[in-house]
Amino acid sequence: MAKRVQLALTESIASLGKEGDLVEVAPGYARNFLLPYGKAMNVTPAVLKQIERKKEKEKIAADKLKQEALDFQTALSTIGRFTIKKQVGEDGVLFGTVTNGDVAEAIEEATKKEIDRRNITVPDIHNLGSFTAKIKLHPEVNAEVNIEVTS
């Protein structure tokens, strides 16, 4: 069996791993593809230290993002209820529905902080009343907000 070469990836490669990972590959793959195209570099003590420092910085940045999400979750629970005004027909049914975009606008208006509508899950809302929407603020942090739909 052929000897394998250990390399540090400089960019993410679907079949191998993500940037900064240490991988073992066939010598020909390393020599003919990864090294010439700058997708990996040989492992040296200096490279290992560099990868370690980069991972520490990424961990600090990820912790900061999580803390910001937790703070925003607290702010949302402090506000408590968001009101959305919609037009209503004679029988009390809304013209259209309340979408995650409507909820995002209401939250942005109240908190002055932009939120991606794709992270908001809203039940089917066709009537006036109170409803609960779920928001994914971070992979580990979710929030629930109360929505009051009025005419």
UniProtKB/Swiss-Prot annotation:
It holds the Pfam family Ribosomal_L9_C. InterPro entries: Ribosomal_bL9 (IPR000244), Ribosomal_bL9/RNase_H1_N (IPR009027), Ribosomal_bL9_bac/chp (IPR020594), Ribosomal_bL9_C (IPR020069), Ribosomal_bL9_C_sf (IPR036791), Ribosomal_bL9_N (IPR020070), Ribosomal_bL9_N_sf (IPR036935). One of its GO terms (cellular component) is ribonucleoprotein complex. The keyword Ribonucleoprotein applies. GO terms for biological process: translation. GO terms for molecular function: rRNA binding; structural constituent of ribosome. It comes from the Bacteria. Keywords: Ribonucleoprotein, Ribosomal protein, RNA-binding, rRNA-binding. Belongs to the bacterial ribosomal protein bL9 family. Binds to the 23S rRNA. This is Large ribosomal subunit protein bL9. It comes from Prochlorococcus marinus (strain MIT 9215).
